[in-house]
Structures are given as structure tokens and as C-alpha cells.
């Protein structure tokens, strides 16, 4: 089976979502009949998020397609200090950047910081689909842009089976409690479309599953 696996958070970095992605990829790749392609965000080696050790744990059979998050995304991404002298100033800059990102995310990052990536990656995914003729597509939430990327591919290939993974709620996540009504309505239109186009769902908790069943 040829699988297109879409995840913003991949084994290029080290967080809980990337570890989940790593486990899924490795378990899928160890099945002899499977050919797994990963479509993900580019986290350069000089990014503070890049983790060579986690990446080394990824099954070498997985084919990676790494797409840039865009010029703005790569510009504001915190970088590793280039030398020892720069460590303190780098840490101060890192704290400043993080605080600014938190303030700005709710304004410019809708639904998240990877939306521009989703648009670019979906175009790459469409070309990949034409070439590879995938049997199934799998996308990982969090963040929502993984699903948005997959949604755009699904719109082009309506017969492609699409499995969506939900680690947390989207709109009802605690980080979105105070978003504006306009933004809520905008994001809900995406969430509804993703749910309507999905063929299969994987939920981490029964409560989350029941909420989506009741909502959609």
C-alpha cells in the first residue's frame, strides 16, 4: 500500500506530536507491503527545534518530502547560537521572539503558523499524487494546517481515501477559547469541511470523538 502521510510536526523536531508521528510512521513502514511518503514542514538544522537524534530513529524506508514554511516563517524561527559568545544574547533574543510570537499568533496565524506551508505543501502533494498514485492519505492534528493541506489534496482527488487523526479538539481547544467570533466562524468552516471530506477518523479520547459526532 502506498501511503501519503501529512504532518507539520515530524521527526525533524522533538515534541509530543512529532513523537506520535514517529511512532505511526515507523509502524506503517515496517509492514513490508507499505511504501510511506511523509509530507512535512522544513525545520532547518540551525533551528532550535531541529533534533538529529529523533530523526535518526525514523525508519529509513520512509520517503521525506520537506516543504518550506515560507519566508516569514523561516525568518522568525529561533536559531541556534553560532558561537559561545552569542549564547546569552541569543537566549535573550529567543525569549523576546517567543513572547512576540505568542502575541502575534492569534492575530496573523490563522488557524496556525503553518497555513502558508499548507497551501504550498498541498501543491506538492497534488503533484506527488499524480506521480505516485497513493492508495490512502493520512493527516495528523495537531496543528490544524496538516488537515488543511490534506483537505486541498482531497478536493483534487475525491476518490482518495483520507484518514484524519485528532489528538485534541480544533475549535474547542483551550488555546482558542478567546478568539474573535469572526475568526471562530472562519476556522469552523475549515473544520467542518475537513470532517465532511474525511473517510475515516482516529480520536485519542472518546470524549473528543463524541463531541465531533454531536457537532458534525
Can you name each region flagged by the protein language model?
Residues 139, 203-204:
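Short beta-strand scaffold positions
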Residues 1-72, 200, 206-209:
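N-terminal subdomain of nucleotide-sugar transferases
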Residues 145-148, 152, 182-201:
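Membrane-proximal helix-turn-helix segments that form the acceptor-binding/catalytic region
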Residues 109, 121, 125-146, 160-163:
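Short N-terminal targeting/anchoring amphipathic segment
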Residues 196-197, 202, 209-216:
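Helix-loop-beta element that forms the nucleotide-linked donor phosphate-binding surface
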Residues 2-3, 136, 151-173:
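Active-site proximal beta-strand in glycosyltransferases
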Residues 161-163, 171-193:
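Nucleotide-sugar donor phosphate/pyrophosphate-binding loop at the beta->alpha transition
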Residues 41-119:
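A conserved catalytic-core segment of Leloir-type glycosyltransferases
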Amino acid at each position: 500500500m502506498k501511503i501519503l502521510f501529512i504532518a507539520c510536526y515530524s521527526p525533524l523536531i522533538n515534541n509530543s506530536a512529532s513523537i506520535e508521528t514517529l511512532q505511526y510512521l515507523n509502524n506503517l513502514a515496517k509492514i513490508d507491503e507499505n511504501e510511506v511518503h511523509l509530507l512535512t514542514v522544513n525545520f532547518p538544522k540551525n533551528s532550535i527545534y531541529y533534533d538529529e537524534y529523533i530523526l535518526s530513529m525514523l525508519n529509513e524506508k520512509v520517503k521525506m518530502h520537506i516543504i518550506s514554511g515560507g519566508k516569514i516563517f523561516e525568518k522568525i524561527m529561533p536559531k541556534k547560537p553560532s558561537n559561545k559568545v552569542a549564547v546569552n544574547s541569543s537566549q535573550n533574543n529567543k525569549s523576546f521572539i517567543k513572547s512576540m510570537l505568542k502575541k502575534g499568533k492569534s492575530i496573523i496565524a490563522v488557524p496556525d503558523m503553518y497555513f502558508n506551508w499548507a497551501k504550498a505543501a498541498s501543491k506538492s502533494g497534488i503533484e506527488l499524487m499524480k506521480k505516485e498514485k497513493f492508495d490512502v492519505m493520512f493527516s495528523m492534528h495537531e496543528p490544524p494546517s496538516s488537515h488543511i493541506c490534506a483537505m486541498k489534496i482531497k478536493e483534487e482527488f475525491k476518490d482518495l481515501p483520507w484518514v484524519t487523526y485528532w489528538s485534541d479538539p480544533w475549535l474547542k481547544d483551550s488555546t482558542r477559547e478567546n478568539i474573535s467570533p469572526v475568526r471562530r466562524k472562519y476556522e469552523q468552516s475549515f473544520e467542518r469541511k475537513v470532517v465532511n471530506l474525511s473517510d475515516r477518523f482516529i480520536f485519542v479520547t472518546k470524549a473528543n470523538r463524541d463531541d465531533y459526532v454531536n457537532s458534525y
